[in-house]
């Protein structure tokens, strides 16, 4: 089963993905994939990092600066992103009970290797929890269960998705 979560920036998509990954892991299941976090300096967002859920390895996804490829004010570090994300997704396909991808978005789409890995995940029978950039919702909504996260519903969405995933994994 695939679960896709979207919402406005800062609503809690990454927090939801991390909380669900932690809870599923606590139940004794293997969780793999990636989480993307903001990098902040002096209270300002200066970039993004990617973290492998199974190893904790960190790579840089984007930073404020000069260079290419760009997305808005950010330079995308395709090599830094791929160094962590591609092996993490490959390992998750081989051995995880749940794959988490945070986020499917325009920055990640600058990587052809990520697009290939995402395609393999979507073709697999693995359970997937993915956060999706709001501009890409229409592309992924038909592929699984879809949730629009808001401050008002985020606790209910967390409980619903967690309950569904735990139920699916316990059926195995």
Swiss-Prot record:
It is an enzyme of class 3 (hydrolase). ATP binds at residues 7-14, 98-105. This is Nucleoside-triphosphatase THEP1. InterPro entries: AAA+_ATPase, Nuc-triphosphatase_THEP1, P-loop_NTPase. Pfam families: NTPase_1. GO terms for molecular function: ATP binding; ATP hydrolysis activity. The keyword ATP-binding applies. Disulfide bonds: none annotated. Its EC number is 3.6.1.15. It comes from Pyrococcus horikoshii (strain ATCC 700860 / DSM 12428 / JCM 9974 / NBRC 100139 / OT-3).
